[in-house]
Amino acid sequence: MQFSLSIATAILAATASAMPVLETRQTVGTTANEFTSGGCKDVVLLYARGTTQAGNMGQEPGPELGNALKARLGAARVAVQGVAYSASLLGNLNPGGAPANEATSFRTLIGQVASQCPNARIVVSGYSQGAALVHRAVEGATAAVRARIAAGVTFGDTQKQQDGGRIPGLDASKTLIICNTGDRVCEGTLIITAAHSGYGARAGEAVDFIAARV
């Protein structure tokens, strides 16, 4: 028995040493704090989730966007940071589609990244009410901070029509607003239909746009 156990141990050790070492994959879930906990990367994605979604990234399309961007550019180059805000139903009823104080907090976060990471390319993004938060945060930022934003991408944007298909203060060449056909919130209403979901499938479209600008 002792002899057999020794042989088995040796075989297991040899097999383990011959196995390839798998690279640990960093996956983005419903919560991501890679800037606040890990600092600067070449690209910092700041993302605001939709109304009532979980964590600070939501169920979709935030995680899909973060993971697709890491896959395209390399996980070591990208820090994904969710935006902490209430994402309440009533938040949508505020002027501009989002609470002013929470837009200010998002704006402060953008400024923090710009200050602490002078070489980083900043990307701002959001879904639904989170898209409105992007609009309100960017429009109130200083010109110097806005100049640091490489791309702004929104999904199911509740402020698309109100703001003329743009993010105020951000150059049109840096802006992509993704809206599904039939998504009524992109038409200036708060009527939720099936078309307001499924934006995770369009993360690749967003990444193509971002990658060309960072």
Swiss-Prot record:
One of its GO terms (cellular component) is extracellular region. Disruption phenotype: Decreases secreted carboxylic ester hydrolase activity during growth on cutin carbon source. Decreases conidiation and results in abnormal germling morphology. Impairs penetration of the host epidermis and decreases virulence in rice and wheat. GO terms for biological process: appressorium-mediated entry into host; carbohydrate catabolic process. It catalyses: cutin + H2O = cutin monomers. The active site is at S128, D183, H196. Residues 1-18 form the signal peptide. Disulfide bonds join C40-C117, C179-C186. Pfam families: Cutinase. One of its GO terms (molecular function) is cutinase activity. The 2 disulfide bonds play a critical role in holding the catalytic residues in juxta-position; reduction of the disulfide bridges results in the complete inactivation of the enzyme. Induction: Induced during infection; levels are increased during germ tube and appressorium differentiation, and during penetration. It is found in: Secreted. SUPFAM superfamilies: alpha/beta-Hydrolases. Gene3D superfamilies: alpha/beta hydrolase. Catalyzes the hydrolysis of complex carboxylic polyesters found in the cell wall of plants. Degrades cutin, a macromolecule that forms the structure of the plant cuticle. Required for efficient penetration of the host plant cuticle by the appressorium during the initial stage of fungal infection. Belongs to the cutinase family. This is Cutinase CUT2. It comes from Pyricularia oryzae (strain 70-15 / ATCC MYA-4617 / FGSC 8958) (Rice blast fungus).
